[in-house]
């Protein structure tokens, strides 16, 4: 049998966890040269016998998406062509559709969605609030240098609270009255000695963390009255807030910070390391060494994996739970320039998005390292930040002075997590 050359047949079993698309569990003889296209035709022919409509599927062979010929995939995995091969098929995630373009006056370096709103930060030192359909609600001055990161603290029908960080070495906390569309700065957070590149609010919205070019990780109260500080009265009177905790350990800029739970933080740095911090112990719990500067990192609560963005065009997957944490689980190839930003889906266990200096966003499945699921096109210059906090929308900001909004048709309202 000449299956090694793509000629000849392979015995396969077709499996799925989506029972509505299940086919009889019997061996099927298929050509070794088949790709996803031929497998879709074959599978849909089987399903039509059950009266089902045509559906697009992706195929997992030994835990990785099939992206070429089956025989080439098996050869790469060193699998014998004489074995019976199990192929798992899943309904293909639908392509997100471009919905809107939000035009700003300068580079958009920070984006964060929550509820009905998109919060943006720009290189003209301003914050902006928008709807997903492009209605501009508010421009907020206050910082004295470009904005680098933003996050929502809380949001309801009446008020929104959020935090922004800047190259002006500060973080600023804001309160927005939605009905009157009025905003005020409630605290200026001082303590960093260089620009503040990253910020993240804790899951319980009690604290937020910042990472800076001064290599320090700082923890701040996110409450309106910082009663836990000995200097609370002075801080309240002056509007200046000081950090609750300062953690030292990185050797270069902290480019990414994310809460894994209310007492555990993930940071990524230009010093080529990821660190997991235990705030109860005020120290480092786990360190993952990489071979590239980390521009962004994202941890998934659904699968406990970490994906990183780096200067060498690649994204990498790590597992912080194992003793081999520094071992790269997968490398994702597809961007043609620095990858600046990355974020996991909060509802889809295997999906994440990235944005890069090649002007492109990409939607990935972590089981498909050789190619993204989709290219999300629209930016005319490099992408600086991407956000998928609202499962219904992927939003990104870029050096073309725009925010691009892509609508995901698969998102379910009941899965949405809005603060």
From Swiss-Prot:
Record-stated family: Belongs to the WD repeat WDR12/YTM1 family.
Location relative to the cell: Nucleus, Nucleolus; Nucleus, Nucleoplasm
Location of the region described as Ubiquitin-like (UBL) domain in the Swiss-Prot/TrEMBL record: 10-91
GO molecular function list: ribonucleoprotein complex binding
Keyword Heme: no
Organism: Drosophila mojavensis (Fruit fly)
InterPro entries on file: G-protein_beta_WD-40_rep (IPR020472), NLE (IPR012972), WD40/YVTN_repeat-like_dom_sf (IPR015943), WD40_repeat_CS (IPR019775), WD40_repeat_dom_sf (IPR036322), WD40_rpt (IPR001680), WDR12/Ytm1 (IPR028599)
Annotated WD repeat ranges: 103-140, 142-184, 191-230, 249-287, 289-328, 334-374, 378-416
GO cellular component terms, A-Z: nucleoplasm; PeBoW complex; preribosome, large subunit precursor
Protein name: Ribosome biogenesis protein WDR12 homolog
Function comment: Required for maturation of ribosomal RNAs and formation of the large ribosomal subunit.
Keywords, ordered alphabetically: Nucleus, Repeat, Ribosome biogenesis, rRNA processing, WD repeat
GO biological process, one term: maturation of LSU-rRNA from tricistronic rRNA transcript (SSU-rRNA, 5.8S rRNA, LSU-rRNA)
Major site of localization recorded for this protein: nucleus
